[in-house]
Amino acid sequence: MSLFRTYVRVLSYLNQEKNAFLLICTANITLAIITIAEPILFGHVIDTIADKSDTLVTLAVWMCFGISNIIAYVLVARGADRLAHRCRLTVLEKSFARIISMPLIWHQQRGTSHALHTLLRATDSMSSIWLEFMRQHLSTFVALFVLVPVTFKMNWRLSIVLMVLAILYILIARLVMQKTKNGQAAVEHYHHNLFKHITDSISNVSIVQSYNRITEETSALHQHTNNLLSAQTPVLNWWALASGLNRMASTISIVCVLLLGAFFVIKGQLSVGEVVTFVGFSQLMIGRLDQISGFINLAVSSQAKLQEFFDMEDSTFQTNEPANLPSLPNVKGAIQFHHVTYEFPNSSQGVFDISFEVKAGQTVAIVGPTGAGKTTLINLLQRVYDPTVGYISIDGININSINRESLRKALATVFQDAGLFDRTIRDNISIGKTGATDEELYEATKTASAHDFILKKSKNYDTLVGERGSQLSGGERQRLAIARAILKNAPILILDEATSALDVETEIRVKNAIDCISQNRTTFIIAHRLSTIRNADLVLFLDQGRLIEKGSFQELINKDGHFYKLLKRGGLTINQPATKEKDDNIIPLRKAMAL
């Protein structure tokens, strides 16, 4: 995207407050035209002094004009500041809403820190450009448009000096833009790397300290800052050179105007006041040209980050689903995978030709070694990814033909990572159901064996859990996540190692709760516990992305196939009595898979 198109697109965001924007633009244009009269009035003051005539009236008019101009500029600048800040926050809110609504694959491809950094830096740059446009850019272009014919009317020979000056500014700016284009893109790249490293290190500060990586992480940051400075220094040098060349050109131009003006005064072709007026025009033009140079500097330095933002914005619009997609009606929970294949880009991993059917209310245990495709299968159901071949249906409806919002309403997921916000316990659980009553909240936490430990906290349900639940134990975090899913009361429940962080006693209670809420509800469990697999209606055994075996627990045992051999390698006794003591003894299937 060219610099001009980038600039126009940035300004297009001001259309959201069109009336205020047009009012400020009109005031700016008026000010720009009126500003040109100031050197003319000052020239008249000089002429009245030279003629020894009454200067009081002319001087008073000039002073009043100058003061009024200052007041008007302050009012316009105030309005521009407010409008720019309002628009910045509006763009931030709308972009944020689009970003968090994107599929998870979109975020995984870009990275959280990259999207955050792009959004914040771009909105800051847009705010600066809006401010400069409403304060200076528009009035500068208008002033130059009016100033050129006025100066030519006064004295075309002196005007040529100013035209040469303008051409020099343009040539210098063009040269610097060409020299810094690639450098500015590199600067933005290193900015992202720097921000990514800081975010990554701070978010994993416990690992950094545990493995005594403070010196190494600081050294790596130092390398990132050196890379940034190495890329930024040449860019800054070029703009410093441009500033010096512009200043030299403007000084030479003023000297030429004064010398030529003095020559014309001696010849009687100009008065002293007219020369002063023309010098004022020269200074006004130099000031406007300096503003244009500053604007070009701002636009060029912002282009790379704005281009990234626009690419991100465009990708959100392209990824957006059609507005007229229907919703899932009265979900019962019958799910079917129809020859589903998904392969990760630039990888041979994924899932391949998966077909199975789950009746409404059944519990499905997904089993397999690490990297077998268990989580990928669940992600396809949640439309984190869309199949490259085949499709998935809920109650006979292709989930690609419905809107994502209704699909998400039908699913309640408990991940291995509880995923808590830095908010209160109440807020974190209430995410499951907006507007839930206290009674519903308490019932959910009691079912998840969370109510008792919550009451022991300093502020009970109003206790802050810290960033990602850092103020809670692993088991406490997991129970809150389960309570959140219980509160949502969705017809389809997904548990990704949901009880892996719990002690045996708590796991028994939570397992009973899960068994309770699984009644009349389709449940998918990524299973690593033998007790979970035994109780499932359907067991899916995956390996290397393929569905190797499926059936009930006993059916797979009777097959004497891969699943049975896996259990046997783990040294587990299959035909032991299913007493409560034995059934609730948590035997890690993961151990068998590792053998």
Swiss-Prot record:
EC id: 7.5.2.3
SMART domains membership: AAA (SM00382)
One of the Pfam families matching this protein, by short name: ABC_membrane
Keyword field: ATP-binding, Cell inner membrane, Cell membrane, Membrane, Nucleotide-binding, Sugar transport, Translocase, Transmembrane, Transmembrane helix, Transport
TM spans (from-to): 21-41, 56-76, 129-149, 158-178, 252-272
Cellular compartments per GO CC: plasma membrane
Reactions accelerated catalytically: [(1->2)-beta-D-glucosyl](n)(in) + ATP + H2O = [(1->2)-beta-D-glucosyl](n)(out) + ADP + phosphate + H(+)
All copies of domain ABC transmembrane type-1, residue ranges: 21-301
Residues annotated to bind ATP: 368-375
Chain ranges of the ABC transporter domain: 335-569
SUPFAM superfamilies from the UniProt entry: ABC transporter transmembrane region (SSF90123), P-loop containing nucleoside triphosphate hydrolases (SSF52540)
Location relative to the cell: Cell inner membrane
Keyword Transmembrane helix: yes
Gene Ontology MF term list: ABC-type beta-glucan transporter activity; ABC-type oligopeptide transporter activity; ATP binding; ATP hydrolysis activity
Role summary: Involved in beta-(1-->2)glucan export. Transmembrane domains (TMD) form a pore in the inner membrane and the ATP-binding domain (NBD) is responsible for energy generation.
Oligomer status and interactors: Homodimer.
PANTHER family associated with the record: ATP-BINDING CASSETTE SUB-FAMILY B MEMBER 10, MITOCHONDRIAL, ATP-DEPENDENT PERMEASE MDL1, MITOCHONDRIAL
Protein name: Beta-(1-->2)glucan export ATP-binding/permease protein NdvA
Source species taxonomy: Bacteria, Pseudomonadati, Pseudomonadota, Alphaproteobacteria, Hyphomicrobiales
